[in-house]
Design a protein with these regions (language model features):
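Recurrent small/Gly-Pro-centered beta-turn motifs in extracellular repeat architectures
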Residues: 19-20, 25-27, 81-88, 152-156, ...
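Loop/turn-rich, solvent-exposed surfaces of beta-rich toroidal or solenoidal domains
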Residues: 190-236
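Blade-level signature of beta-propeller repeat domains, shared across WD40, Kelch, NHL, RCC1
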Residues: 255-280
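Structural motif
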Residues: 28-36, 79, 87-105, 158-172, ...
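Surface-exposed loop and turn segments in beta-propeller and other repeat-based domains
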Residues: 4, 43-62, 106-136, 174-202, ...
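Hydrophobic alpha-helical segments and helix pairs
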Residues: 76-142, 146
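Beta-strand-rich domains and repeat architectures in extracellular enzymes and scaffolds
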Residues: 3-31, 206-207, 216
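Structural signature of eukaryotic scaffold interfaces centered on beta-propeller domains
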Residues: 8-18, 58-81, 130-150, 201-211, ...
Length: 280
């Protein structure tokens, strides 16, 4: 692997790429939009926006992805997915395993979103998901667009493994109406699991993406010897980890955050906003 620097954007969490634009999210629901072709060391965002209802339910955006389906067929953008992760870790309801689904619309250089659905893992307190004293029991997700699958995966501390679950991708019409948020909430139960498998433990999961059946999952913290920045490749067909690469071997030790593909190109960004093409 090698990194090729493209420029610098706002600090933040994961994000997504679509139509030659990079959408960089922070942990409060704010997104900065950049044209990839215009990236430089002093990149100016095309615009910024705040996710709908972020004052009531704000994703950490530990994992972000565009799906395949659109809210309306004529929409420019597919549905946008962003997870809560640990934003409500100290709340009565920590919203473990919850992903928010948005309709993204553009008018000129302005963007707005509408919260249209919630997807939640309905068994986060079950031993099949958690192992008792997990430090981060919130789970990440990745979407296999080619096969129409929703992958959820979580850190299991007791067994020192990652547990992966696949589900049919929820349709926008699925779910039960949530009066509080005014959208449908899909609860994925154990009976909905298509496949389940274990892989080696990851040291604090960050952004993730599924591309051609491979989950590219980031992990680690800046300059941490105990939890070094790294990327793992998980083959969902073979149900095994096929690659572990430490970013120090690629010339950086900054916390990894964002990863996505467009037109066969892998885009990667760290917490500080450095954006690269990641070549394999």
């Amino acid at each position: 692997m090698e990194l090729k620097k493209l420029g610098k954007v706002a600090k933040g969490q994961d994000g997504a790429v679509f139509g030659g634009m990079l959408f960089r999210f922070d942990a409060t629901g704010t997104c900065f939009v950049y044209k990839i072709r215009d990236l430089s060391e002093e990149s100016t965002p095309l615009c910024q926006f705040v996710l709908d209802k972020a004052d009531r339910i704000a994703p950490h955006s530990n994992s972000v992805a565009f799906g395949c389906a659109r809210y309306e067929e004529k929409d420019e953008f597919p549905l946008l997915y962003s997870n809560i992760y640990n934003n409500y870790a100290k709340a009565d309801d920590p919203l473990k395993g919850v992903t928010c689904v948005y309709r993204l619309q553009r008018q000129g250089d302005s963007f707005c979103t509408t919260l249209v659905q919630l997807i939640e893992i309905g068994f986060t307190d079950d031993p099949v998901w958690c192992s008792g004293a997990d430090v981060r029991p919130y789970g990440n997700f990745a979407i296999d667009k080619e096969k129409g699958l929703y992958y959820a995966f979580t850190m299991r501390d007791a067994s020192q493994t990652m547990e992966y679950f696949s589900f049919p991708m929820p349709a926008l019409s699925d779910g039960i109406y949530d009066e509080a948020l005014g959208v449908k909430r899909v609860t994925l139960c154990k009976k909905d699991i298509l496949e389940q498998f274990s892989c080696p433990y990851q040291q604090y999961i960050q952004g993730a993406v599924c591309h051609k059946g491979i989950i590219y999952s980031l992990e680690g913290f800046t300059d941490s010897a105990e939890n070094p920045p790294a990327i793992r490749l998980v083959d969902t067909a073979a149900k095994k980890q096929t690659c572990l690469t430490y970013f120090k071997d690629l010339g950086t030790t900054v916390e990894p955050e964002l990863i996505d593909f467009e037109d066969g190109i892998c885009y990667y960004a760290d917490h500080d906003g450095n954006v690269f093409v990641l070549n394999f």
